């Protein structure tokens, strides 16, 4: 009986750890994060199979960023207007496609010191046995508008946990809930950097 209980506990812990994805964080040590008073967020790019993932993730990220924000955040309308003024060609908003000169021009046009750009890599329900769980993966970069350099990056992948018939803690069943958790984590890490 004791062996079965130990096996059950170890199995549950292993499954819980597997359901948590990791993250990667880069902070440019030379950047003065106290300098940023007004920043902007561009709509995230979408590499996932869900056509609406960019709107859902960008909206959730912006909401989390606005909560207890230490900086002023330009409106999405102002950012899109500036983006159209500066970027004349049709392309997606992949962080890798924004040049240093374009970031500097966006900063001047939108009157911001930094830009957050991101990409949704995965946004889906994945099957595990007979159940489906949410999977969300995003990468967010903060670009300094004076230098055009990337000064902060956060990449994260999270998958919802399996259902336990007896224990129901720490589970995430919907893409909306998982998106909110991922965006809260990224926005929180960014706000901590601004301290």
Locations of regions flagged by a protein language model:
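Bacterial N-terminal signal peptides that target proteins for export
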Residues: 1-9
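C-terminal/domain-edge helix-coil "capping" segments
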Residues: 20-37, 97-100, 106-110, 132-135, ...
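Short glycine/proline-enriched turns and hinge-like loops at secondary-structure junctions
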Residues: 52-54, 130-133
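Generic short beta-strand segments
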Residues: 119-124, 157
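Extracytoplasmic/secreted cell-surface and envelope-processing proteins
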Residues: 125-129
């Amino acid at each position: 009986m004791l062996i079965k209980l130990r096996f059950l506990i170890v199995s549950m812990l292993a499954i819980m750890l597997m359901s948590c994805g990791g993250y990667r964080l880069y902070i440019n040590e030379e950047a003065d994060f106290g300098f940023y008073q007004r920043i902007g967020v561009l709509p995230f790019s979408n590499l996932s199979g869900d056509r609406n993932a960019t709107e859902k993730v960008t909206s959730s990220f912006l909401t989390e960023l606005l909560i207890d924000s230490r900086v002023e955040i330009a409106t999405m309308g102002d950012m899109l207007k500036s983006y159209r003024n500066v970027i004349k060609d049709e392309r997606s908003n992949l962080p890798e496609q924004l040049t240093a000169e374009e970031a500097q021009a966006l900063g001047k046009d939108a009157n911001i010191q930094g830009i957050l750009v991101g990409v949704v890599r995965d946004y889906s329900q994945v099957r595990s046995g007979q159940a489906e769980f949410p999977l969300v993966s995003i990468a967010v970069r903060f670009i300094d508008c004076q230098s055009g350099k990337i000064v902060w990056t956060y990449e994260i992948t999270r998958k919802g946990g399996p259902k336990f018939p007896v224990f129901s803690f720490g589970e995430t069943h919907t893409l909306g809930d998982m998106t909110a958790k991922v965006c809260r984590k990224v926005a929180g890490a960014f706000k901590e950097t601004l301290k």
